[in-house]
């Protein structure tokens, strides 16, 4: 019986070998546990039209499963809203929470492949941090991910991606994500 050797994701290896040391020097942490890291990545795809046509949620679930490599959780409406013809319990979105190696591989694919494929991409807004080092940004369509076959897209679906870090301030989170290769706009 052969033992399959587990390889470390490329971005995780770079974080452990280079980025942690540079962040420690930059911010002068007294303890190695203070160095910020990525905790999880949440990918959310809201499908508001699913209230009218329940089949639309299946396309979002399939797209998210292909992009992230993990089965999405279907999000349901918490309360009824008559103006939107929405009833409590109707499916209105899909969400995936990535941790561990899957998270590192997704971030690597996002930064190295998906973001550069966006047309007229000028960089991510560096001001979209939440005050505690977490970063959220939106993508307008799913076609920039190479896992999705462009010909099989029935409709463009946007998504929100939240990168949750253990940083305590926005500056620490920004420095971490910039070191990981996130293309932020220069002011």
Swiss-Prot record:
InterPro entries: Ribosomal_uL5, Ribosomal_uL5_bac-type, Ribosomal_uL5_C, Ribosomal_uL5_dom_sf, Ribosomal_uL5_N. GO terms for cellular component: ribonucleoprotein complex; ribosome. SUPFAM superfamilies: RL5-like. Keywords: Ribonucleoprotein, Ribosomal protein, RNA-binding, rRNA-binding, tRNA-binding. One of its GO terms (molecular function) is tRNA binding. GO terms for biological process: translation. Belongs to the universal ribosomal protein uL5 family. This is one of the proteins that bind and probably mediate the attachment of the 5S RNA into the large ribosomal subunit, where it forms part of the central protuberance. In the 70S ribosome it contacts protein S13 of the 30S subunit (bridge B1b), connecting the 2 subunits; this bridge is implicated in subunit movement. Contacts the P site tRNA; the 5S rRNA and some of its associated proteins might help stabilize positioning of ribosome-bound tRNAs. Part of the 50S ribosomal subunit; part of the 5S rRNA/L5/L18/L25 subcomplex. Contacts the 5S rRNA and the P site tRNA. Forms a bridge to the 30S subunit in the 70S ribosome. HAMAP family: Ribosomal_uL5_B. This is Large ribosomal subunit protein uL5.
């Amino acid at each position: 019986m052969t033992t399959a050797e587990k390889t470390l994701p490329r971005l995780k290896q770079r974080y452990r070998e280079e980025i942690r040391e540079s962040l420690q020097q930059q911010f002068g942490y007294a303890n190695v546990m203070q160095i910020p890291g990525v905790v999880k990545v949440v990918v959310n795809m809201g499908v508001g039209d699913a209230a009218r046509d329940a089949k639309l949620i299946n396309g979002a679930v399939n797209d998210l499963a292909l992009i992230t490599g993990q089965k999405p959780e279907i999000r349901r409406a918490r309360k009824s809203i008559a103006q939107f013809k929405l009833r409590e319990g109707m499916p209105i979105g899909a969400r995936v929470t990535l941790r561990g190696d899957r998270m590192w591989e997704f971030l690597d694919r996002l930064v190295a492949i998906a973001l550069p494929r966006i047309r007229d991409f000028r960089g991510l807004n560096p001001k979209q941090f939440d005050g505690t080092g977490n970063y959220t940004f939106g993508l307008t369509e799913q076609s920039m991910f190479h896992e999705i076959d462009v010909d099989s897209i029935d409709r463009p679906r946007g998504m929100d991606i939240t990168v949750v870090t253990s940083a305590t301030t926005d500056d620490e989170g920004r420095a971490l994500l910039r070191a990981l290769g996130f293309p932020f706009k220069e002011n």
